Design a protein with these regions (language model features):
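ATP/NTP-dependent adenylation/nucleotidyl-transfer catalytic domains that generate, transfer
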Residues: 1-168
């Protein structure tokens, strides 16, 4: 699982969470998708573009837990990854209060309605609060930026807690 999925517990226990190392556990999904598109077209000197990534990049992310006919897509289950990652960074790294975070979302994501932004934020808070127990069990991962969700070293949150609320 990547950091975006870890934040909201979008993983199967002893499936995604099994093992001693989570190579992409410290990387958010939005960054990972941009990096894969870059690797498809450019990639580092000497390696050249990896054209086979076209087949990966053409697909919408999906956990594939439901029958294929259901059309399950991660962003339909959760929210757009760009918004999820913006909420995660503002909440975890910047320690923003719910009202300030909602104001930030309003300014940054003008294509979305007030109701959509409130729903995304409420969903994030609900999933974050419900899934600390999963974050406690994830394997260690590489961290490429200035924060992580590792409860043993950076982001401690109580397993038993009330859900965070957005002011009316």
């Amino acid at each position: 699982s990547n950091r975006s999925e870890i934040a909201v517990g979008y993983a199967t226990m002893d499936g995604d969470t099994a093992g001693g190392l989570a190579p992409i556990g410290g990387i958010d999904k939005h960054f990972l998708r941009k990096w894969l598109r870059w690797a498809e077209h450019e990639c580092p000197l000497g390696l050249g573009p990896i054209s086979a990534l076209k087949f990966v990049n053409e697909q919408e992310p999906t956990a594939e837990l439901r029958p294929a006919a259901s059309g399950q897509k991660d962003e339909l289950d959760l929210m757009p990854y760009e918004i999820l990652n913006a909420i995660e960074a503002a909440f975890v790294r910047d320690r923003m209060e719910p009202e300030s975070l909602l104001n930030t979302l309003r300014e940054r994501f003008t294509a979305y309605s007030e109701k959509q932004l409130r729903d995304f934020l409420a969903r994030f808070y609900r999933l974050w609060s419900q899934n600390q127990w999963k974050r406690e069990r994830y394997a260690s991962g590489f961290h490429l930026d200035d924060y992580n969700l590792d409860p043993t070293s950076w982001c401690r949150y109580p397993i038993l807690s009330v859900e965070l609320k957005i002011p009316d």
